[in-house]
UniProtKB/Swiss-Prot annotation:
Function as written in the Swiss-Prot or TrEMBL entry: Catalyzes the conversion of L-asparagine to L-aspartate and ammonium.
GO molecular function terms listed in the Swiss-Prot or TrEMBL record: asparaginase activity
Active site: 61
Name of this protein: L-asparaginase 2
N-terminal signal peptide: 1-19
Gene name of the encoded protein: ansZ
Induction of the gene: Expression is induced during limiting-nitrogen conditions by the nitrogen regulatory factor TnrA.
Subunit structure: Homotetramer.
Coiled-coil regions listed in the entry: none
CDD domains cross-referenced by the UniProt entry: L-asparaginase_II (cd08964)
Remaining remarks: B.subtilis contains two L-asparaginase isoenzymes: L-asparaginase I, a low-affinity enzyme located in the cytoplasm, and L-asparaginase II, a high-affinity secreted enzyme.
Ranges for region Disordered: 22-46
Binding of substrate, residues: 108, 141-142
The species this protein was found in: Bacillus subtilis (strain 168)
SMART domains for the chain: Asparaginase (SM00870)
Length: 375
């Protein structure tokens, strides 16, 4: 009898400690279960005195891998998921409450307009919440500057948005991805980074999306701001040196909230013996805008100018940029009279981003030129 009472008591205690006294468990779908686990994990480790940073992963070399640790070029980009990227840098938990989500996992040459819109909309949604203090986007370096500038024009918040990548895959000896990611999270959580537009962090440097560009095919110091200089540096602490003067983020005229697609804008590269047929082909393919990467100060050959003039008369906006990599493309009276616009100091790939967004607002050449002068 005594043994039976002890058994009943033991069973009751077990019932309480295992939570069986609660109502029956509701069965979750695998998707719901995964979401619940993710939220629970984040809540359990969250520190109230640290900034909440969301990492949005898109792929690229930073998510690349290869069987050889010595390979820095023969790897596959976009194969490592966001959770693995976060787990590889546990030190981030000391500077921020970090959570992540996978937007896509591709090499950045495969980032298209649909992905750009998806990313910008997701960032705006997240930053509208008081629970998110900053965003880090992991991205391939090949087109990183294009995405960065697009976000610089379309994010509607002064909270920090930082784009980060790497030049070596995650499996390489001395991979630069973990350090870059740590620094990006640090910058995204810094109060001083607010109001500076979209920033790019690699190789201990902080750059403005407006001016930064990739300058080398393989080296880790590939991103430069050339004549304009870096916004800041990271040496344990963050040091901001320059202010951003061009309009950006919440001060721009552009919004992606109601956009499902962007106008087709193509880039034509100028060279000796180029011809009007290049413009004809772009117009025939459906281009609403064309950026011409001209020689020198956005110069066109006679043949190219004929093609550009023809495109404008068919309702296509043409913007002159330069293939030189530096300098301002200045207005030219002869070109201006034909509505061949000047990109100011935007390189061709960034001029394309601005022109796509400008064309969602207007087709007026003077208004579009004003955008290039402002942004």
């Amino acid at each position: 009898m005594k043994k039976q009472r002890m058994l009943v008591l033991f069973t009751a205690l077990l019932f309480v400690f295992t939570g069986c006294s609660h109502s029956p468990e509701t069965k979750e779908s695998p998707k719901e279960k995964a979401q619940t686990q993710k939220v629970s994990s984040a809540s359990a480790s969250e520190k109230k005195d640290l900034p909440n940073i969301r990492i949005l992963a898109t792929g690229g070399t930073i998510a690349g891998a290869d069987q050889s640790k010595t390979s820095t070029t023969e790897y596959k980009a976009g194969v490592v998921g966001v959770e693995s990227l976060i787990e590889a840098v546990p030190e981030m938990k000391d500077i921020a409450n970090v959570s992540g989500e996978q937007i896509v996992n591709v090499g950045s040459t495969n980032i298209d307009n649909k992905i750009l819109l998806k990313l910008a909309k997701r960032i705006n949604h997240l930053l509208a919440s008081d629970d998110v203090d900053g965003i880090v986007v992991t991205h391939g370096t090949d087109t990183l500057e294009e995405t960065a500038y697009f976000l610089n024009l379309t994010v509607k918040s002064d909270k920090p948005v930082v784009i980060v990548g790497s030049m070596r895959p995650s499996t390489a000896i001395s991979a630069d991805g973990p350090s870059n990611l740590y620094n990006a999270v640090k910058v995204a959580g810094a109060p001083e980074a607010k109001g500076k537009g979209t920033l790019v962090v690699l190789n201990d440097r902080i750059a403005s999306a407006r001016y930064v560009t990739k300058t080398n095919t393989t080296t880790t110091d590939t991103f430069k701001s050339e004549e304009m200089g870096f916004v800041g540096t990271i040496a344990d602490d963050i040091y901001f040196n320059n202010e951003i003067t061009r309009k950006h983020t919440k001060d721009t005229d552009f919004s992606v909230s109601n956009l499902d697609e962007l106008p087709q804008v193509d880039i034509i590269y100028g060279y000796q013996n180029d011809g009007s047929y290049l413009f004809d082909a772009a117009v025939k393919a459906g281009a609403k805008g064309i950026v011409f990467a001209g020689s020198g100060n956005g110069s066109l050959s006679d043949a190219a100018e004929k093609g550009a003039d023809s495109a404008v008369k068919k309702g296509v906006t043409v913007v002159r940029s330069t293939r030189t990599g530096n300098g301002v493309v200045t207005p030219n009276q002869d070109y201006a009279e034909k509505d061949l616009l000047a990109s100011n100091s935007l390189n061709p790939q960034k001029a394309r981003m601005l022109l796509m967004l400008a064309l969602t607002k207007t087709n007026d050449p003077q208004k579009i030129q004003a955008y290039f002068n402002e942004y």
